[in-house]
A protein has these predicted regions:
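Conserved ABC transporter NBD signature motif
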Residues: 1, 8, 309-317, 326
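Conserved ABC ATPase "signature" region
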Residues: 46-64, 362-380
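Conserved ABC ATPase signature
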Residues: 68-72, 76, 384-388, 392
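Catalytic Walker B motif of ABC-type/P-loop ATPase nucleotide-binding domains
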Residues: 93-96, 409-412
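A short, surface-exposed alpha-helical micro-motif characterized by mixed small hydrophobic
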Residues: 134-136, 450-452
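Conserved ABC ATPase "signature" C-loop
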Residues: 146-147, 462-463
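Helix-to-loop junction immediately C-terminal to a conserved catalytic motif
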Residues: 301
Length: 509
């Protein structure tokens, strides 16, 4: 308590949960933003340049060196914020959900980089919702509940606790599947990571189909990542055919997208000749940071106008409609809730949208209270949204769009900062809206959530659609997933590496 902030910041680096709150806004390029802290410390110019280049390479953001940080995607901004702290080389680094907006490959890179720092002697303290990564990389985990310490132990000890769900924590996917099959280590704990689970491979049940294939195939081709049987080859053929047109035939189309192109900066394409039809199945859009996902849904909402191509909603050209005209039809929840929230009370925030599409004050309040109840925040109706945590502000933003009762709901990274309870709430909302016949489209980096909640998956990379199909079709294509810097869901990956032929997405199946 006696140490000044100026003295402490030279020893302890803090990466905020929300990168928008960390970037200074005083610098016009990524390079200058990362160097900003070093300038304040008086680091010599040559050393400063060396450090900035080093962390940009480490976090794979060198290509954005001369871009304005606020022109980047949320995930790219998160890397820039992290780079600014890593460049200062503090003795202790505190990370508040540093990978919440990163694609799976980006998350792995950050965890690997942080692990390297930890092994070099730097103390790392991390708040995270990605328990599978924590199980793999953390030495100790502190379990908190309502501000009190419940336990401080190794990942396997923490995640093997029978009372874990009482504290709002769902064990990692690998632990859950080991619990289902009764696979335990000699010390009585369940494996918490993929490596630990595979070390006990012989304890898992073996599918008969896999046993026959194993005898026939021997040791050949086990790790090629290519489809290994006729069924998977047929799936690959079908999905490639779909990728030619980017369409899936399933009932009435809600959106028709034709030859869509967009760019923010001249000669820097963001979307390149995108062709899609979107029907009313729950649809997840996945892919690397900067793939053009958020840009695509903003175009669907009418917030941006394409430089060429057309978007039709219900047969009508969106270019002929204003944002106000689409507001009652298409709801959009921003990636960053702070870009959406502006009222001083939660209830007023959630009522704002309904009132602006023609509802009376009484109708708007009724819809707002219903929406707040759906997201579990009715008790916070009179609170200031800015006094809430990021996870709660995200739910407020979702409620404000739910209250408008639109036919289409677009969710940009709905699970950011959400714990197990929040994820479950959002998952139930998606299922309920789908049952009502509404169209739900979501951008996500959480592949397990995608597999559990969505029927259709669209994979994007570098402004193009790489794959478009059912989750079974898409998650069978390891080469496409790799191109898009995403991975199979954790449960799927474990079952695949155990040798199971079928793709499994939930424990129930």
């Amino acid at each position: 308590a006696k140490t000044s902030v100026s003295a402490l910041c030279q020893k302890v680096g803090l990466v905020f949960q929300n990168p928008f709150n960390q970037l200074s806004g005083a610098k016009e390029t990524v390079f200058e933003e990362i160097a900003f802290g070093l300038q304040n410390f008086g680091v010599p110019k040559e050393e400063m340049i060396s450090r900035v280049n080093e962390v940009m390479e480490l976090l794979d953001i060198a290509a954005y060196r001369d871009r304005n940080p606020f022109d980047l995607s949320g995930g790219q901004m998160q890397r820039v914020a992290l780079a600014g702290i890593l460049a200062m080389k503090p003795e202790v680094i505190v990370l508040d959900e540093p990978t919440s907006q990163l694609d799976p490959a980006g998350s792995e890179e950050v965890f690997a980089a942080v692990d390297k720092l930890a092994k070099s002697g730097i103390t790392i303290i991390m708040v995270e919702q990605k328990l599978e990564k924590m199980a793999e990389y953390c030495d100790k985990i502190l379990l908190l509940h309502q501000g009190k310490q419940i336990a401080f132990d190794t990942p396997e000890q923490i995640f093997s606790r029978e009372d874990l769900k009482n504290y709002g924590v769902n064990p990692p996917a690998y632990t859950r599947i080991c619990q289902k099959f009764g696979v335990k280590k000699e010390n009585g704990c369940y494996p918490a990571s993929l490596r630990e689970a595979l070390a006990l491979k012989e304890m898992f049940p073996v599918e008969e189909a896999f046993a026959r294939r194993k005898c026939a195939a021997g040791s050949a081709g086990e790790t090629s990542g290519k489809p290994e049987n006729a069924e998977n080859e047929q799936i690959q053929s079908e999905i490639v055919d779909k990728n030619v047109s980017g369409t899936v035939d399933c009932g009435k189309n809600v959106f028709n997208i034709e030859h869509l192109k967009f760019q923010y900066l001249e000669n820097v394409p963001v979307l390149q000749d995108v062709n899609l039809t979107i029907d009313n199945r729950p649809t997840a859009i996945v892919g690397q940071n900067g793939a053009g996902k958020t840009t695509l849904v903003k175009l669907l909402k009418g917030l941006l106008k394409p430089i060429s191509g057309n978007i039709y909603y219900g047969g009508d050209d969106i270019a002929q409609k204003t944002v106000a005209m689409l507001a009652g039809e298409i709801g959009y929840v921003f990636q960053n809730p702070d870009d959406q929230i502006f009222k001083y009370h939660v209830i007023d925030e959630v009522m704002f949208g309904p009132q602006n599409i023609g509802m009376t004050k009484e109708q708007a309040k009724e819809k707002a209270l219903q929406a707040l109840e759906l997201v579990g925040l009715k008790q916070l109706a009179d609170e200031n949204p800015y006094d809430l945590e990021l996870s709660e502000r995200k739910l407020v933003a979702i409620a404000s769009v739910l209250a408008m009762d639109t036919k289409v709901l677009i969710l940009d990274e709905p699970t950011i900062a959400q714990d197990w309870k929040g994820r479950t709430i959002i998952q139930n909302i998606i299922k309920d809206l789908s049952k009502q016949g509404k169209t739900v489209i979501a951008i996500l980096h959480d592949m397990d959530f995608v597999a559990e909640s969505f029927e259709r998956v669209i994979v994007m990379a570098h402004g193009k659609v790489l794959a478009d199909g059912t989750k079974e079709e898409v998650f069978a294509q390891k080469d496409i997933l790799e191109q898009a810097r995403i991975d199979q869901p954790y449960l799927t990956k474990l079952c695949q590496q155990l040798g199971y032929e079928k793709l499994y997405f939930t424990l129930e199946k």
